């Protein structure tokens, strides 16, 4: 029998219903795995007592044949989802001891379906990073190793703790957030399915904000079916979020295994020209195109002429919104306060923020403050917003001809910790292929599609029309079936 912590969400639900094991046993297996792999630093707060209590309640529900859709299923939450009575820090010193008195809508939705929370996962501070190396709790180490080197690798970011937890069998699924690629890129680096739904599908209420017009909750799982199950639980209109979309939550699980006949897949191969894309990624992209063609899809050449400006646009708009959102951390109402005798209020603000924020967060606040200034507004911010509209228009034009778009999730495989962190521009380019869909608010997923020459997982990205999570899952499922001969599992786990 498969070890309990290695079961997918779907198989765990089946086993619990069949009474092959209890939720308490399932949770116990995951706790044991978490304790065994503390060195990866995936979790920053454990909630084992809560999890065992929730598991006992789940076992009673199964005994009474009254189980909900996620009854007894273990999940983890990125540490920017507020959890009532449980420390929530965004992995920043400025919030290191913050305990919310309310629950985020997304975690509440999962609890309402019977989910069991194992803990809060590590992340880049305030979700600003691509390698999970800016957390106040230290770096996250990927469970994966290259086959020619034993060096520690990054899990991707900013949701690196969630990716490491699911990839290392320390959670069946884990919540992340995706602003410019923070679910899709770590999923690619760790051999997982990472899904970012349409902007507004999941409530942002109770999510600590980075860039409000871009932030969206996402999910890490080890299968496309699991992704569909979790998305059905997470999504839904919420009147507490002004950007929440008033749309019915679709039935998604029937997308799995659906025929690709009459599906048109757009491929903007020109985006791979002259970029930093590695040869292994290019080969994986081409192989996936052939896979979908053989499955019955029609491949259509498309262009996204303004997508190449995505990174530049993103690093104007996102820091501008961050500068505004993070102005609330001033030491007055909550979080860190640095005080000295005879200190003025302005000095307290300055000391609190300079002590509490890390270097990358300070960099982005400074960029954002400048582009919102009188000299930067016309020169950068307003122009970036215009180009953002052009990027969205490119997608609209493409989707008049195709049902989904295929792109790599990242230009490279996972790299060594410390290898690129001294060059912010190189780090920002990790999101080269994920940012355009974020700017347009589109649903998209990364699904494992191959291994590099060094044995590291590579993810392909499927982008869908607004509110069309169904077709994204359909294409992802076809790709998953086509590469089922590849084992996307780190050695030693």
UniProtKB/Swiss-Prot annotation:
GO CC annotation: glutamyl-tRNA(Gln) amidotransferase complex
Top-rank taxon: Bacteria
Active-site residue numbers: 78, 158, 182
Protein encoded by which gene: gatA
PANTHER family per record: GLUTAMYL-TRNA(GLN) AMIDOTRANSFERASE SUBUNIT A (PTHR11895:SF151), TRANSAMIDASE (PTHR11895)
Reactions performed catalytically: L-glutamyl-tRNA(Gln) + L-glutamine + ATP + H2O = L-glutaminyl-tRNA(Gln) + L-glutamate + ADP + phosphate + H(+)
Annotated function: Allows the formation of correctly charged Gln-tRNA(Gln) through the transamidation of misacylated Glu-tRNA(Gln) in organisms which lack glutaminyl-tRNA synthetase. The reaction takes place in the presence of glutamine and ATP through an activated gamma-phospho-Glu-tRNA(Gln).
Annotated Gene3D superfamilies: Amidase signature (AS) domain
Record keyword Nucleotide-binding present: yes
Major enzyme class: ligase
Keywords from the UniProt entry: ATP-binding, Ligase, Nucleotide-binding, Protein biosynthesis
Name the record gives this protein: Glutamyl-tRNA(Gln) amidotransferase subunit A
Gene Ontology MF term list: ATP binding; glutaminyl-tRNA synthase (glutamine-hydrolyzing) activity
GO biological process, one term: translation
Stretches of the chain forming a coiled coil according to its record: none
Source lineage: Bacteria, Pseudomonadati, Pseudomonadota, Alphaproteobacteria, Rickettsiales
Subunit structure: Heterotrimer of A, B and C subunits.
EC number: 6.3.5.7
Membership in a protein family: Belongs to the amidase family. GatA subfamily.
């Amino acid at each position: 029998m498969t070890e309990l912590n290695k079961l997918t969400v779907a198989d765990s639900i089946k086993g619990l219903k069949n009474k092959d094991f209890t939720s308490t046993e399932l949770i116990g297996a995951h706790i044991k795995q978490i304790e065994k792999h503390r060195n990866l630093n995936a979790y920053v707060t454990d909630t084992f007592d809560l999890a065992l209590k929730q598991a006992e309640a789940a076992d009673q529900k199964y005994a009474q044949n009254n189980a909900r859709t996620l009854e007894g299923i273990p999940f983890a939450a990125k540490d920017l989802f507020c959890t009532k009575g449980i420390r929530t820090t965004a992995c920043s010193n400025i919030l290191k001891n913050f305990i919310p008195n309310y629950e985020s809508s997304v975690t509440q939705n999962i609890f309402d379906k019977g989910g069991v929370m194992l803990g809060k996962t590590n992340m880049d501070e305030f979700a600003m990073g691509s390698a999970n190396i800016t957390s106040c709790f230290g770096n996250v180490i990927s469970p994966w190793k290259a086959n020619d080197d034993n060096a520690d690798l990054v899990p991707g970011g900013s949701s690196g703790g969630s990716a490491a937890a699911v990839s290392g069998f320390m959670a069946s699924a884990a919540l992340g957030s995706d602003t410019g690629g923070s679910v899709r890129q770590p999923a690619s680096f760790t051999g997982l399915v990472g899904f970012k739904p349409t902007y507004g599908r999941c409530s942002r209420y109770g999510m600590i904000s980075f860039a409000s017009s871009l932030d969206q909750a996402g999910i890490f799982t080890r299968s496309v079916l699991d992704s569909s199950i979790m998305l059905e639980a997470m999504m839904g209109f919420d009147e507490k979020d002004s950007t929440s979309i008033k749309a019915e939550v679709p039935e998604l699980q029937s997308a799995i295994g659906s025929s690709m006949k009459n599906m048109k897949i757009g491929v903007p191969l020109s985006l791979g020209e002259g970029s930093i894309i590695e040869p292994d990624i290019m080969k994986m992209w081409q192989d996936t195109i052939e896979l979908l063609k053989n499955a019955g899809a029609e491949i259509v050449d498309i262009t996204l002429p303004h997508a190449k400006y995505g990174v530049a646009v993103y690093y104007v708009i996102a820091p501008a919104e961050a500068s505004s959102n993070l102005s609330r951390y001033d030491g007055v109402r909550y979080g860190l306060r640095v005080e000295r005798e005879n200190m003025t209020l302005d000095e307290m603000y300055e000391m609190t923020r300079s002590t509490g924020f890390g270097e990358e967060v300070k960099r982005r606040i400074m960029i954002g403050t400048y582009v919102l200034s009188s000299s930067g507004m016309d020169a950068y911010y307003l122009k970036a917003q215009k180009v953002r509209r052009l990027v969205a228009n490119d997608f609209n034009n493409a989707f008049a001809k195709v049902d989904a778009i295929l792109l790599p999730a990242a230009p490279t495989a996972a790299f060594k910790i410390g290898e690129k962190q001294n060059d912010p521009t190189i780090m920002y380019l990790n999101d080269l292929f994920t940012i355009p869909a974020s700017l347009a608010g589109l649903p998209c997923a990364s699904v494992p599609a191959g291994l590099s020459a060094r044995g590291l997982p590579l993810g392909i990205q499927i982008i869908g029309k607004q509110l069309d999570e169904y077709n994204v899952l359909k294409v992802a499922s076809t790709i998953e079936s086509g590469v089922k001969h590849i084992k996307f599992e780190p050695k030693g786990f």
